[in-house]
Amino acid sequence: MIGYALYVVHQRGISKRCNKVWFVIVPNDEEGSIMSSLKGSRTERNVMIAFAGESQARNRYTFFASQARKEGYQQIAAIFEETANQEKEHAERLFRFLEGGEVEIKAAFPAGVIGNTLENLKAAAAGENHEYTTMYPEFARIAREEGFTEIAAVMEAIAVAEKQHEKRYLDLARNIEQGRVFKRDEEVAWRCRNCGYIHVGEEAPERCPACDHPKGYFELLGENY
């Protein structure tokens, strides 16, 4: 949506009967008002900040996946990688809104270290929480104020995904803290991620009898189809 200021310009001709009137439409690009172009707007800067944040999250989650594998958490590693790919999709959607050139931004980004998997899950959850509770709602509000309703809607939709990311990370962290990654209080079905073997019991086997992969490859059997 583009907003305009309307000015009426009168010009009296040589003949007293000849009065010409022009309606001059001028884009109203003042900060806080509806913008005619993304360039130079607060939303342009916010889109760039969000793009940078999503891009960095993608890399962090890839690093965290490698750490999870080192600790034997194959499923958690796969979830980090899946989420990294989802952050890439967010970044690409935001990047496509930009109109070229250079955009100068001032922003703070996480400069954390790669910790153990429990620490990484909690750090990732905190980042997702900030995005869906603070950053994206504020950026969407500004975008809507400036007339960029499509960008606002996309940011609000991304926030929905980030909320789910946080929940999953917190659930996985809780499983580690409670010793429930490979052990439950009741008999459940465990699936080997490598070959598909199914084991029923309170705890995943030390090694898969079908493919000989270690316990870290087992996950709870779930059917979402």
PLM feature spans:
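Short hydrophobic alpha-helical segments enriched in small aliphatic residues
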Residues: A5-Q11, V24
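Cysteine-cluster motifs in flexible loop/terminal segments that predominantly coordinate metals
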Residues: V8, C18, E203-P205
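Short, Lys/Arg-enriched N-terminal segments with co-localized hydrophobic residues
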Residues: K16-I34
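Non-heme di-metal
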Residues: E31-Y225
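Intrinsically disordered, low-complexity sequence elements enriched in Ser/Thr/Gly/Pro
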Residues: H10, S15, E54-R58
